[in-house]
């Protein structure tokens, strides 16, 4: 069934941080929605590129050779194999487009790893 998605309404349903939800599917990829605040772990993805789109807020992506600041309406693609660390001083709403096999923590498995993201 084809249906539209209201991004604002979907984000209102998310009440926690660093727990990506599936907002849609595109071929072999998920469109994930997540609220974040604070710092995440350094990690990389061995086999998948990862796209971060900032819907609300300001996101800092730390890289081993610097950092990139993303504001509302901006996105970045982190190529596979590149270590990165997302940081949000204030609450940030992100859309992520990534293959279904992508773990949110990449090559690291810990208490923040979401093995089976739920739909929203």
Model-derived regions: residue spans:
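Short acidic-glycine-tyrosine-enriched beta hairpin
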Residues: 64-80
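A short, N-terminal "cap"/entry segment at the start of jelly-roll beta-barrel domains
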Residues: 1-32, 111-120
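Short, charged/polar surface micro-motifs in flexible loops or helix N-caps
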Residues: 28-30, 37-39, 56-60, 67, ...
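A cytosolic small-molecule/anion-sensing beta-strand core signal
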Residues: 27, 55-56, 71-72, 90
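Short, conserved beta-strand element in jelly-roll/cupin
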Residues: 35-36, 45-63, 97
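Ligand-binding loop in jelly-roll beta-barrel domains
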Residues: 80-109
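Conserved short histidine dyad/triad with adjacent acidic residue
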Residues: 16, 30-46
């Amino acid at each position: 069934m084809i249906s539209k998605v209201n991004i604002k309404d979907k984000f209102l349903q998310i009440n926690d941080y660093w727990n990506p939800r599936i907002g849609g599917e595109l071929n072999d990829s998920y469109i994930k929605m997540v609220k974040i605040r604070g710092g995440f772990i350094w990690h990389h993805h061995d086999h998948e590129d990862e796209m971060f789109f900032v819907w609300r807020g300001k996101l800092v992506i730390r890289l081993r050779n610097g950092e990139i600041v993303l504001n509302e309406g901006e996105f970045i693609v982190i190529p596979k194999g590149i270590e990165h660390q997302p940081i949000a001083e204030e609450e940030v709403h992100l859309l992520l487009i990534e293959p279904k096999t992508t773990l949110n923590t990449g090559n690291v498995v810990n208490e923040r790893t979401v093995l089976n993201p739920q739909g929203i």
